[in-house]
C-alpha cells in the first residue's frame, strides 16, 4: 500500500490530510480511555462526559473536512488519486467509529455499580490492550512496516478472540446478569477491530481492506 500514499506524502499533496487522520485516531483513543476509566473505576461519568462528547465532535468535524479535502485532491490529481482517496475514505470511517463506541461505553457507566469487581478485572487488561493498539495503529500507518503490521493483525485477532471467550462465558452463566460486561467487551472488541482495519491497509490490497483474517469493526 506504500505507493498509494506517495502523492499524499508530497508536501504539496495531502500531508495535512494525513495529519487530520492521525488526529482522529488520537482523539478516538483519548475518548475511549476516558470512557473505560469511568466505567471500570465506578466514578461519576458526568465528570468526563463533556470532554468525551467534545472529542467525538472534533473527530466528526475532522472526518467531514477530510472527505471534502479528498474530493478536491482527487479532482486536482485526476484518476491517479482515486485509489488513495478510496482507501483513506474507508479508513476515516474506522477512526470515526471509535468515538461512537466511547460514547456507548460512557452511557453504560451511568448505571451504578454496572460492573462487578470480577468483570472489571477481566475487562481492564483487554481495554488497555485495545487502547495500546490504537496508538500503535497510527504509528504503523505512518511507517508502513509490513512485517510489523502482519504481527499486529495476529495480535489483534487474539484480542478479539479473548473478548469473544469472555462474552461466551458470561452468557453461559445462568446465575448472574453480565449484560453490561458483555456490551462493554463487545465495544472493546470492535475498537480493536477498527484498529486492525487501519493496519490492514499496510498489507492488504484495496479490495481486501477490512477483510484481514478475523478482522473488522462492525461487520461481525
Segments and roles (model prediction):
Residues 1-220:
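Cytosolic, long alpha-helical scaffolding segments
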Amino acid at each position: 500500500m506504500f505507493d498509494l500514499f506517495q502523492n499524499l506524502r508530497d508536501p504539496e499533496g495531502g500531508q495535512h490530510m494525513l495529519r487530520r487522520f492521525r488526529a482522529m485516531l488520537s482523539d478516538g483513543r483519548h475518548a475511549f480511555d476516558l470512557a473505560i476509566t469511568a466505567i471500570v473505576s465506578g466514578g461519576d461519568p458526568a465528570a468526563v462526559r463533556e470532554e468525551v462528547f467534545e472529542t467525538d465532535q472534533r473527530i466528526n468535524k475532522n472526518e467531514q473536512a477530510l472527505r471534502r479535502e479528498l474530493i478536491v485532491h482527487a479532482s486536482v490529481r485526476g484518476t491517479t488519486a482515486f485509489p488513495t482517496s478510496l482507501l483513506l475514505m474507508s479508513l476515516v470511517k474506522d477512526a470515526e467509529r471509535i468515538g461512537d463506541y466511547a460514547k456507548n461505553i460512557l452511557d453504560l457507566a451511568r448505571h451504578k455499580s454496572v460492573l462487578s469487581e470480577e468483570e472489571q478485572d477481566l475487562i481492564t487488561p483487554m481495554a488497555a490492550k485495545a487502547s495500546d493498539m490504537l496508538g500503535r495503529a497510527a504509528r504503523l500507518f505512518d511507517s508502513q512496516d509490513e512485517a510489523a503490521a502482519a504481527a499486529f493483525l495476529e495480535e489483534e485477532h487474539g484480542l478479539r478472540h479473548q473478548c469473544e471467550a469472555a462474552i461466551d462465558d458470561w452468557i453461559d452463566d445462568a446465575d448472574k446478569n453480565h449484560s453490561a460486561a458483555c456490551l462493554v467487551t463487545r465495544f472493546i472488541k470492535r475498537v480493536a477491530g477498527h484498529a486492525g482495519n487501519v493496519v490492514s491497509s499496510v498489507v492488504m490490497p484495496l479490495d481486501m481492506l477490512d477483510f484481514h483474517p478475523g478482522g473488522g469493526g462492525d461487520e461481525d
